[in-house]
A protein has these predicted regions:
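Catalytic centers of nucleases
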Residues: 5, 12-13, 17-79
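Acidic metal-coordinating catalytic centers involved in nucleic-acid phosphodiester chemistry
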Residues: 1-12, 62-129
């Protein structure tokens, strides 16, 4: 057999490699008392001395554009809000994706707006659907 199968192990290996690179980058920036964990509560967790300084990173490797209705964004939020996940242990949820923002995506300003504006943006997207 020549070529790659749809479920090639290479894709899984590359995804984990990407997680390790993101985690390694965070390792170089660790402060006293902080730790990095892989696949603890999600893809990469930075646990600090208090919950507000801890962060949970979901690392995604997608080639299509990140649009307002993209499953990647909404599935990440859904998982974070599951009753069995204790999001109170983390001050931040970061979606670290290889996706470019879609041209008409209202999410494209996500990284420059505050928490209240993000919540309002989510409400607006939900009200359109």
């Amino acid at each position: 057999m020549c070529g790659k199968t749809k479920n090639s192990a290479l894709i899984t290996a590359l995804a984990f490699h990407y997680q390790v690179l993101v985690g390694l980058d965070k390792c170089f920036k660790l402060k006293e008392g902080e730790s990095i964990f892989f696949e603890k509560d999600g893809d990469v967790s930075l646990v600090g001395q208090n919950d507000s300084s801890s962060l949970q990173m979901e690392i995604k490797n997608y080639s299509d554009s990140l649009t307002d209705n993209h499953l990647n964004f909404w599935k990440t939020l859904k998982n974070w809000l599951q009753p069995e996940f204790n999001q109170a242990k983390y001050g931040y949820l970061i979606l670290h994706t290889t996706q470019p923002f879609g041209v008409s995506s209202t999410l494209k300003n996500w990284n420059t707006i505050d928490i209240e504006e993000r919540l309002e943006l989510i409400r607006k997207i939900c009200s359109k659907n």
